[in-house]
Design a protein with these regions (language model features):
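Mid-domain, small-residue-enriched loop/turn segments at the edges of structured enzyme/sensor domains
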Residues: 206-329
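Bimodal feature
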Residues: 109-112, 152-155, 160-164, 198, ...
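Structured C-terminal helix/loop/strand segments within mature extracytoplasmic catalytic/sensor domains
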Residues: 10-84, 96-104, 111, 300-435
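Hydrophobic transmembrane alpha-helical segments in integral membrane proteins
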Residues: 1-13
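Juxtamembrane/transmembrane-helix boundary motifs in multi-pass membrane proteins
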Residues: 1-2, 28, 74, 195, ...
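Sec-dependent N-terminal signal peptides of Gram-positive bacterial secreted proteins and lipoproteins
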Residues: 84-92
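Carbohydrate-binding/catalytic loop surfaces
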Residues: 186-193, 260-266, 367-368, 375
Length: 435
């Protein structure tokens, strides 16, 4: 729930209870109405926070509940009005919430200009749908950073048990910039008693980057590993469409650097879009350096970007092709990395096996890293089933509207599972995306 959702819900409660300041309004009927209204609002909040129900869907059910609990609903006139509305809303709710793996396939087919899909089975690439097109990676780029970390551990440049101060990580922490990922990681570290003297191990920092997608951990690792080393590694691997990497958190403030007092939002957007990649990434590097030295203190900062500025930021994220990440996944999945590096990267990537024990009943290996913004939804995953069959899946989806994003998030797990486990569905996907 965002700020406006909280304001709306709390506002309903406030205006429901406000009339009871007057004693004459405290009738039994009005009190019952208030209890129902407040109960429904609290139910909406709990559904969103505890059960991860989409806010709009929860509000829709709340609206239906209010109609059902209103005695006036059950007059003949109102029933004639409400029954068709209820049927329409029920159908729309079913369409939104039903499990529909085909939705992802249909979206790919209908939006080739904004979608890439890569699929390989036992080392053979069977789908390369717009897979050579560079698209924004969002947090999927963290796979490359994890790979460089694993290689530097292999080469004895770094030690996994090296201690890292949480103060050093906090230099790159901007509140509300990663969907609560960094806070979630810290909470788990505390629960598992892994914080000693305000320090954690380097390997746990890397796990926080992949498992929880902490942006602060990511930028810390970029500085530690060296951006030059990360970029050299991607070139060595032949990731031909992959941009050079630059810090993630500092890029959020590029608009503040470019903006002048006289500049309108439209002019600012024009200036940001006019920056070359080198100019844009240079500003990000300079800001990140100031964060590391403490010259730019994020502890007092808040982030407020309009949706239009978020779109520019999203479009200018580090980009690569689905082929690039298919190549990285094959290196990991087919054990083409040095022994220690392979062990390290698998330990990072295979968090779904560690957090969800049920996966062990179906797979020998399952590694995954996604990435998203308001407009982007990506995933890169490798799987080895109990029979030894190996699969690599990469999809990069851009220019999503809120409904598309919601439906893909809702159905992508079932799409991935069906693609891996259902031979007929796999054949259908291959046929539809290779015509």
């Amino acid at each position: 729930m965002n700020l406006w959702a909280w304001v709306g819900m709390l506002g309903i409660i406030l205006f429901t209870l406000l009339p009871f300041i007057e004693k004459k309004k405290r009738t039994r009927e009005e009190i019952q109405k208030a209890i129902v209204t407040v109960g429904i609002v609290l139910g909406i909040i709990l559904a969103v926070l505890l059960f991860d129900i989409n806010y709009l869907v929860a509000v829709l059910f709340g609206f239906l509940a209010m109609i059902l609990f209103d005695r006036k609903t059950y007059t003949k006139k109102r029933l004639i009005i409400y029954i068709p509305i209820a049927l329409i809303l029920s159908y729309l709710t079913y369409a939104l919430l039903r499990n529909n793996p085909n939705y992802v396939l249909e979206h790919l087919k209908e939006h080739p200009e904004n979608s890439s899909f890569y699929f390989a089975e036992n080392g053979e690439v069977t789908v390369a749908y717009e897979s050579d097109i560079k698209r924004p990676l969002a947090s999927t780029v963290k796979i490359l950073i994890a790979l460089e970390y694993a290689m530097q551990v292999e080469e004895n440049q770094l030690q996994k048990d090296m201690l890292v101060s949480l103060d050093d990580l906090s230099k790159f922490y901007l509140k509300n910039s990663d969907g609560g990922a960094h806070e979630s990681w810290l909470e788990v570290m505390k629960q598992n008693n892994k914080i000693k003297d305000n320090q954690v191990t380097l390997h746990d920092v890397a796990k926080g980057m992949i498992t929880y997608s902490s942006n602060a951990n990511t930028d810390y690792l970029m500085h530690l590993l060296g951006v030059e080393a990360i970029n050299a590694r991607k070139n060595q691997l032949g990731l031909n469409q992959h941009d050079d990497v630059y810090p993630i958190v500092s890029a959020l403030y590029i608009s503040d650097v470019v903006k002048t007092d006289e500049m309108s939002d439209e002019e600012l957007i024009h200036e940001l879009e006019a920056l070359s990649f080198d100019e844009y990434s240079t500003i990000a590097h300079q800001l990140s350096q100031k964060m590391q030295t403490g010259e730019f203190d994020l502890s007092e900062e808040t982030l407020e970007l309009s949706s239009k500025l978020q779109k520019v930021w999203s479009d200018r994220l580090i980009g690569a092709s689905a082929n690039d990440y298919g190549k990285i996944l094959q290196l990991i999945s087919h054990d083409q990395l040095p022994t220690d590096a392979a062990k390290t990267i698998r330990d990072l990537m295979e968090w779904p096996m560690q957090l969800n024990k049920d996966n062990k009943e179906h797979y020998l290996h399952l590694g995954s890293k996604g990435g998203s913004t308001m407009f982007v939804l990506n995933n890169a995953m490798y799987v080895e089933d109990l029979k030894g069959n190996q699969f690599e899946i990469v999809y990069l989806l851009d220019e999503l509207n809120p409904l598309e994003s919601f439906l893909i998030r809702k159905n992508r797990n079932s799409f991935e599972a069906k693609l891996i486990n259902d031979v007929d569905f796999r054949k259908e996907v291959i046929q539809e995306l290779t015509q």
